[in-house]
């Protein structure tokens, strides 16, 4: 459902930020 899509998008965003900060 929409919640699953939102969670997946949010998780991806967090991973992207974490990767950016790690670099």
From Swiss-Prot:
The modification Asparagine amide is found at residue 23. GO terms for cellular component: extracellular region; membrane; other organism cell membrane. Expressed by the skin glands. The keyword Cytoplasm does not apply. GO terms for biological process: defense response to bacterium; innate immune response. Keywords: Amidation, Amphibian defense peptide, Antibiotic, Antimicrobial, Immunity, Innate immunity, Membrane, Secreted, Target cell membrane, Target membrane. The keyword Nucleotide-binding does not apply. It is found in: Secreted; Target cell membrane. Belongs to the frog skin active peptide (FSAP) family. Alyteserin-1 subfamily. Antibacterial peptide with amphipathic alpha-helical structure. Shows selective growth inhibitory activity against the Gram-negative bacteria E.coli (MIC=25 uM) Has a weak hemolytic activity against human erythrocytes (LC(50)>100 uM). Is very weakly active against S.aureus (MIC=200 uM). This is Alyteserin-1a. It comes from Alytes obstetricans.
